[in-house]
């Protein structure tokens, strides 16, 4: 077994994903040391948003090559969602001083995608034709 496969089995992440994690940690440390952590956090969140928009655009592209790029971007955004959510919560904590509002924002940011996904699956179950019986 190659060493890349051993790393993938042990961590669940590919080598390029691990390198991106280390790069983001290095950027956050440099931002902290140079007292520009807020700017670095905003920049990382903006980069995440651009990546999500590019993923959504490329998923509908007629050429297969661009859809494969969208698959890579989807894997990247899935990997980085939790980190981006924590950076957003930290940035919100710099502006909001109400802990209750921060808790609600945290629940919305962290649990929101799971709830939307479950609701979307539930709607799909109601649109089945009568020949596709679903036991409940």
From Swiss-Prot:
It is found in: Cell inner membrane. Its main location: membrane. InterPro entries: Uncharacterised_YbhQ. It comes from the Bacteria. Residues 1-12, 59-71, 121-136 are cytoplasmic. Residues 34-37, 93-99 are periplasmic. The chain crosses the membrane at residues 13-33, 38-58, 72-92, 100-120. GO terms for cellular component: plasma membrane. It is a multi-pass membrane protein. This is Inner membrane protein YbhQ. It comes from Escherichia coli O6:H1 (strain CFT073 / ATCC 700928 / UPEC). The gene is ybhQ.
């Amino acid at each position: 077994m190659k060493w890349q496969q051993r790393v993938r089995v042990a961590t669940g992440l590919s080598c390029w994903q691990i390198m991106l994690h280390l790069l983001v940690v290095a950027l956050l440390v440099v931002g902290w040391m140079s007292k520009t952590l807020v700017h670095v956090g905003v920049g990382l969140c903006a980069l995440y948003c651009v990546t999500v928009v590019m993923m959504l655009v490329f998923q509908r592209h007629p050429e297969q090559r661009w859809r494969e790029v969208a698959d890579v971007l989807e894997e990247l955004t899935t990997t980085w969602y939790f980190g981006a959510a924590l950076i957003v919560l930290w940035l919100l904590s710099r502006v909001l001083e109400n802990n209750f509002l921060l808790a609600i924002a945290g629940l919305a940011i962290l649990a929101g995608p799971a709830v939307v996904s479950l609701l979307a699956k539930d709607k799909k179950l109601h649109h089945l034709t009568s020949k596709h019986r679903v036991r409940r």
